UniProtKB/Swiss-Prot annotation:
One matching Pfam family: Ribosomal_L35p
UniProt KW keywords: Ribonucleoprotein, Ribosomal protein
Protein name per UniProt: Large ribosomal subunit protein bL35
GO biological process per UniProt: translation
Family of the protein in this entry: Belongs to the bacterial ribosomal protein bL35 family.
Signal peptide: none
Transmembrane regions listed in the UniProt entry: none
Organism phylogeny: Bacteria, Pseudomonadati, Chlamydiota, Chlamydiia, Chlamydiales
Gene label: rpmI
NCBIfam families attached to this UniProt entry: rpmI_bact
Location of the region described as Disordered in the Swiss-Prot/TrEMBL record: 1-56
InterPro entries: Ribosomal_bL35, Ribosomal_bL35-like, Ribosomal_bL35_CS, Ribosomal_bL35_sf
Superkingdom in the source lineage: Bacteria
GO terms for cellular component: cytosolic large ribosomal subunit
Amino acid sequence: MPKMKSNKSVAARFKLTGSGQLKRTRPGKRHKLSKKSSQEKRNLSKQPLVDKGQVGMYKRMMLV
């Protein structure tokens, strides 16, 4: 049987922390930044944790 493949789009979007939680990036920080205030850009830089209900699904996709 061949090896299982992880979902590469999920693996690129989420990072696993040491305690097993997942961090994600906020959308809207790639382009058209001149229209956004410094405060908005700073808040977009923060990486929130994924909700508890979705963590299991994403971990299965990442084969963690």
